Amino acid sequence: MPTVLCRLPNHVGDCCMCLPALRLLAASGFTPALVGKRWAEDLMAGMGGRFDPIEGKVTEDLSRIRYLAQNANTSEGLLFPNSFGSALLFKLGRLKTTGLKTDMRSFILDNGIPEPGTMHEVKRFFYVAHEAIKSWGATPAFDKVPERLSLVLMKRHEAAAKNLIEQYKIPARFALLAPIARGKHQGKVKHWEHFNELVAPLRDIGIEPIVFPSLR
C-alpha cells in the first residue's frame, strides 16, 4: 500500500478529530505515516504506524522531511493544518503536497483542495482526506464520517489513568475540563469563558470536575 506522510495538527483535540480521516486513508489502501509535535507520538501510539516528530526548528525539520521522502517509501504529503508553514515545509521537503487552499498557500500545493463550507472540524479533516484520495486517482472506501473517533489506547495508557484516579482519589463520576484553546478564529475569541461557572452545577449533580489547564 502506498504511504502518505500526514502532517497532524498542533493541538490534542484536533489530532483526535483527525482519526476518522486517518482511518479512511487506511481503508482506502493507503498507509498513513504521521508527522507532528513530539507529544502526539504517545497519543497516536495505538494506531501502530510510523510517527516522526517535528519540533519547529526549520533546518532540522526540513532534513527530517527530506529523509522521510527518500527513505519511507512515500512521495505524497497530506496536510491537516491550514498553515502556510506546514505546506512550505512539505514542499521544500520534496513531497507532492495536498491540502486545503488556505492561508494563501495555493501556489505551493500540488493538489489544492477547495475550502468546504462551515462544518465540524471532524468533518473538515475527513473532507480533506476524502478529496485527497480522489485527487490521487483512488476511490474512498466510505463517504460518511464515522460516528466515533475510535482513539486506540495502549495498556500503559489505561494503567496510567488508573494510577491517576487512585492517586488523586477521583470519584467514579467525573468530567474533564480542558480550557486551553487560545487566540482568535475569524475575529472571535476561541476559548470558552464560562468554565468557572460550570464547576458548581456539575458538583450539584454529583459530577466532580477535573481541570486540565494548558502547561503553556
Task: Place the predicted regions along the sequence by residue.
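Catalytic machinery of carbohydrate-active enzymes
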Residues: M1-R216
